[in-house]
């Protein structure tokens, strides 16, 4: 099975207008990504406010994204849920629509044991036939995979990658030393992506690449072509943006940035609220300093 989880993957925002999906804005956003030659996109993940969508909105968003992309790059659906049966349903609907893979985090709030986490993913794996990227994001879920659970899950044939949004930079080394099959490790934090790659990572699932996909793609390419100095130069240039995108809960700052660039409204779903004036000013100054052209 081809491993689609590598390189620069953009975690796409979900644009709204008048509390409905703005599908015209979605097309502009996706074409911007495709033109920058990103390796794949994630739809309805954390950055895409997936947990704030109704099931009907989720289906419409995925179907529209799949139609717009039209097989030019892989489309990965966020299928995370606290309820295993619901996660299976999200994966089943995604499969019908024709996505290329899933990104799934452990259930949040419930705080399952490692045994429960394993059985959750095993059930989704057995109910589907598409590749899965595990998503470690303990700051949101309240639980994380142990190395042992990652190793055990990697033995399931279609679990092919881990997106790691934690801060344990030794983990890629530890995981690579015990997993024999091709199992890709991707960073879930833009600011740590080069350090993560240096420890065995093969890419980044990025928030910043919503705003500047060409620079983020160039950074990953330079690194993997052994141009460490060039990659580091881009990374240093983008560091203020990385930091600004998390001064408030993601995706509040990136949603404002995309509005400022003209892609969509600044509308965000409760319980999230729009960026403060201080954050807006910071985002505007950084975008201006980067001379981003869309």
Curated annotation (Swiss-Prot):
<feature type="binding site">
    <location>
        <position position="47"/>
    </location>
    <ligand>
        <name>pyruvate</name>
    </ligand>
</feature>
<protein>
    <recommendedName>
        <fullName>4-hydroxy-tetrahydrodipicolinate synthase</fullName>
        <ecNumber>4.3.3.7</ecNumber>
    </recommendedName>
</protein>
<feature type="site" description="Part of a proton relay during catalysis">
    <location>
        <position position="46"/>
    </location>
</feature>
<keyword id="KW-0963">Cytoplasm</keyword>
<feature type="active site" description="Schiff-base intermediate with substrate">
    <location>
        <position position="163"/>
    </location>
</feature>
<comment type="subunit">
    <text>Homotetramer; dimer of dimers.</text>
</comment>
<keyword id="KW-0220">Diaminopimelate biosynthesis</keyword>
<dbReference type="GO" id="GO:0005737">
    <property type="term" value="C:cytoplasm"/>
</dbReference>
<dbReference type="InterPro" id="IPR013785">
    <property type="entry name" value="Aldolase_TIM"/>
</dbReference>
<comment type="similarity">
    <text>Belongs to the DapA family.</text>
</comment>
<dbReference type="GO" id="GO:0009436">
    <property type="term" value="P:glyoxylate catabolic process"/>
</dbReference>
<feature type="binding site">
    <location>
        <position position="205"/>
    </location>
    <ligand>
        <name>pyruvate</name>
    </ligand>
</feature>
<feature type="site" description="Part of a proton relay during catalysis">
    <location>
        <position position="109"/>
    </location>
</feature>
<keyword id="KW-0028">Amino-acid biosynthesis</keyword>
<dbReference type="InterPro" id="IPR020625">
    <property type="entry name" value="Schiff_base-form_aldolases_AS"/>
</dbReference>
<dbReference type="Pfam" id="PF00701">
    <property type="entry name" value="DHDPS"/>
</dbReference>
<keyword id="KW-0456">Lyase</keyword>
<dbReference type="InterPro" id="IPR005263">
    <property type="entry name" value="DapA"/>
</dbReference>
<dbReference type="GO" id="GO:0008700">
    <property type="term" value="F:(R,S)-4-hydroxy-2-oxoglutarate aldolase activity"/>
</dbReference>
<dbReference type="GO" id="GO:0019877">
    <property type="term" value="P:diaminopimelate biosynthetic process"/>
</dbReference>
<keyword id="KW-0457">Lysine biosynthesis</keyword>
<dbReference type="InterPro" id="IPR002220">
    <property type="entry name" value="DapA-like"/>
</dbReference>
<feature type="active site" description="Proton donor/acceptor">
    <location>
        <position position="135"/>
    </location>
</feature>
<comment type="pathway">
    <text>Amino-acid biosynthesis; L-lysine biosynthesis via DAP pathway; (S)-tetrahydrodipicolinate from L-aspartate: step 3/4.</text>
</comment>
<comment type="function">
    <text>Catalyzes the condensation of (S)-aspartate-beta-semialdehyde [(S)-ASA] and pyruvate to 4-hydroxy-tetrahydrodipicolinate (HTPA).</text>
</comment>
<dbReference type="GO" id="GO:0008840">
    <property type="term" value="F:4-hydroxy-tetrahydrodipicolinate synthase activity"/>
</dbReference>
<dbReference type="InterPro" id="IPR020624">
    <property type="entry name" value="Schiff_base-form_aldolases_CS"/>
</dbReference>
<keyword id="KW-0704">Schiff base</keyword>
<dbReference type="GO" id="GO:0009089">
    <property type="term" value="P:lysine biosynthetic process via diaminopimelate"/>
</dbReference>
